[in-house]
């Protein structure tokens, strides 16, 4: 199992969401404790970043296999997420 860490801006963004969207995103983030058990995609042009799609939202994260840490760097709507990297 990996430890999941959330960036400050992720926490701030999640606080602004409605409860239904927040639950869906937290559910996806919890699954990152075992990051390679579910389908994942790499972010194009960024060899160290991965993404998960949750409806209109994207979760952008990095996996440190050596230290067993998943760092969630960004959660945002698709149209804004990739511009903020």
Residue ranges, per PLM feature:
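Enriched for short, Lys/Arg-rich terminal
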Residues: 1-5, 15-23, 54, 62-85
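A short, surface-exposed loop/turn module that caps and links secondary-structure elements
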Residues: 28-52, 82
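Flexible interhelical turns and helix-capping residues at alpha-helix boundaries
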Residues: 14, 18, 33-36
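Basic, amphipathic "hinge/linker" alpha-helix immediately C-terminal to the N-terminal HTH DNA-binding motif
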Residues: 6-10
